[in-house]
Amino acid sequence: MLFGTAVVTGVMLMWPLVSRLLGASTPQVGPTEAVQLINRRDALVLDVRDKTDFAAGHIPNARNIPLPELDGRLREIEKFKARPIVINCQSGARSAGVCGLLKKNGFGEVFSLRGGIGGWVEASLPVEK
Protein backbone atom coordinates (compact mmCIF):
# COMPACT_ATOMS: atom_id res chain seq x y z
CA MET A 1 0.00 0.00 0.00
CA LEU A 2 2.76 2.43 0.97
CA PHE A 3 4.72 1.56 -2.18
CA GLY A 4 1.66 2.23 -4.35
CA THR A 5 1.16 5.62 -2.74
CA ALA A 6 4.81 6.48 -3.35
CA VAL A 7 4.54 5.53 -7.03
CA VAL A 8 1.36 7.58 -7.53
CA THR A 9 2.91 10.57 -5.78
CA GLY A 10 6.05 10.29 -7.92
CA VAL A 11 4.02 10.16 -11.12
CA MET A 12 1.99 13.19 -10.07
CA LEU A 13 5.14 15.17 -9.31
CA MET A 14 6.72 14.25 -12.65
CA TRP A 15 3.59 14.75 -14.78
CA PRO A 16 4.25 18.41 -15.76
CA LEU A 17 7.70 17.48 -17.07
CA VAL A 18 6.46 14.36 -18.87
CA SER A 19 3.55 16.17 -20.49
CA ARG A 20 5.87 18.91 -21.75
CA LEU A 21 8.25 16.35 -23.22
CA LEU A 22 5.37 14.58 -24.94
CA GLY A 23 4.14 17.82 -26.48
CA ALA A 24 1.10 18.20 -24.26
CA SER A 25 2.04 21.78 -23.40
CA THR A 26 -0.18 23.29 -26.08
CA PRO A 27 -2.32 25.88 -24.32
CA GLN A 28 -5.96 24.89 -24.41
CA VAL A 29 -9.04 26.95 -23.67
CA GLY A 30 -12.54 25.74 -23.07
CA PRO A 31 -15.51 27.29 -24.85
CA THR A 32 -16.17 29.82 -22.06
CA GLU A 33 -12.53 30.94 -22.02
CA ALA A 34 -12.61 31.23 -25.82
CA VAL A 35 -15.65 33.52 -25.62
CA GLN A 36 -13.77 35.72 -23.15
CA LEU A 37 -10.75 35.91 -25.47
CA ILE A 38 -13.02 36.79 -28.38
CA ASN A 39 -15.00 39.44 -26.50
CA ARG A 40 -12.27 40.99 -24.36
CA ARG A 41 -9.19 40.67 -26.55
CA ASP A 42 -10.61 40.43 -30.08
CA ALA A 43 -9.20 36.94 -30.60
CA LEU A 44 -9.30 35.42 -34.06
CA VAL A 45 -11.02 32.05 -34.33
CA LEU A 46 -9.26 29.95 -36.96
CA ASP A 47 -11.29 26.94 -38.07
CA VAL A 48 -9.08 24.32 -39.73
CA ARG A 49 -11.88 21.91 -40.70
CA ASP A 50 -12.67 21.29 -44.35
CA LYS A 51 -15.02 23.63 -46.21
CA THR A 52 -17.97 21.24 -46.02
CA ASP A 53 -17.77 20.89 -42.24
CA PHE A 54 -17.29 24.64 -41.88
CA ALA A 55 -20.37 25.33 -44.02
CA ALA A 56 -22.44 22.93 -41.90
CA GLY A 57 -21.85 25.11 -38.83
CA HIS A 58 -19.06 27.21 -37.38
CA ILE A 59 -18.27 29.67 -34.61
CA PRO A 60 -19.52 33.15 -35.56
CA ASN A 61 -16.89 35.24 -37.38
CA ALA A 62 -14.46 32.32 -37.59
CA ARG A 63 -12.00 32.30 -40.46
CA ASN A 64 -11.79 28.99 -42.34
CA ILE A 65 -8.46 27.74 -43.64
CA PRO A 66 -8.61 23.94 -44.03
CA LEU A 67 -5.66 22.18 -42.44
CA PRO A 68 -4.15 20.85 -45.72
CA GLU A 69 -4.07 24.44 -47.06
CA LEU A 70 -2.82 26.18 -43.92
CA ASP A 71 0.92 26.17 -44.59
CA GLY A 72 0.41 27.86 -47.96
CA ARG A 73 -2.11 30.38 -46.64
CA LEU A 74 -0.40 31.68 -43.49
CA ARG A 75 0.03 35.08 -45.13
CA GLU A 76 -3.75 35.57 -44.86
CA ILE A 77 -3.55 35.70 -41.09
CA GLU A 78 -0.20 37.51 -40.67
CA LYS A 79 -2.00 40.66 -39.53
CA PHE A 80 -3.35 38.76 -36.51
CA LYS A 81 0.07 37.89 -35.03
CA ALA A 82 -0.36 40.33 -32.16
CA ARG A 83 -3.83 39.04 -31.24
CA PRO A 84 -4.79 35.81 -29.51
CA ILE A 85 -5.78 33.04 -31.92
CA VAL A 86 -8.13 30.23 -30.97
CA ILE A 87 -7.69 27.19 -33.21
CA ASN A 88 -10.82 25.16 -33.83
CA CYS A 89 -11.19 21.74 -35.43
CA GLN A 90 -13.80 19.01 -35.11
CA SER A 91 -12.80 17.58 -31.72
CA GLY A 92 -9.69 19.47 -30.61
CA ALA A 93 -7.22 16.79 -31.73
CA ARG A 94 -5.75 18.51 -34.82
CA SER A 95 -5.66 22.00 -33.38
CA ALA A 96 -2.67 21.24 -31.12
CA GLY A 97 -0.45 20.65 -34.16
CA VAL A 98 -1.72 23.85 -35.74
CA CYS A 99 -0.76 25.74 -32.58
CA GLY A 100 2.78 24.45 -32.97
CA LEU A 101 2.91 25.51 -36.63
CA LEU A 102 1.69 29.01 -35.82
CA LYS A 103 4.15 29.36 -32.93
CA LYS A 104 7.02 28.38 -35.24
CA ASN A 105 5.86 31.09 -37.64
CA GLY A 106 5.93 33.88 -35.07
CA PHE A 107 2.37 33.92 -33.78
CA GLY A 108 2.45 34.74 -30.08
CA GLU A 109 -0.70 33.61 -28.32
CA VAL A 110 -2.28 30.53 -29.84
CA PHE A 111 -4.78 28.29 -28.10
CA SER A 112 -6.42 25.00 -28.99
CA LEU A 113 -10.19 24.96 -28.40
CA ARG A 114 -10.76 22.04 -26.04
CA GLY A 115 -13.37 19.74 -27.58
CA GLY A 116 -13.37 21.60 -30.90
CA ILE A 117 -16.68 22.57 -32.45
CA GLY A 118 -18.28 19.65 -30.61
CA GLY A 119 -17.32 21.19 -27.26
CA TRP A 120 -18.57 24.56 -28.44
CA VAL A 121 -21.97 23.15 -29.43
CA GLU A 122 -22.14 21.09 -26.23
CA ALA A 123 -21.69 24.33 -24.27
CA SER A 124 -24.81 25.67 -26.07
CA LEU A 125 -22.87 28.45 -27.76
CA PRO A 126 -24.03 29.86 -31.11
CA VAL A 127 -22.98 28.56 -34.50
CA GLU A 128 -23.67 30.07 -37.88
CA LYS A 129 -24.08 28.48 -41.27
Show where each model-derived region lies.
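Short, surface-exposed ligand- or partner-binding patches at beta-edge/loop junctions that are enriched
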Residues: 87-88
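Conserved beta/loop motifs at nucleotide-recognition and modification sites
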Residues: 46
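Rhodanese-like catalytic fold shared by cysteine-dependent sulfurtransferases
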Residues: 1-43, 51-84, 94-129
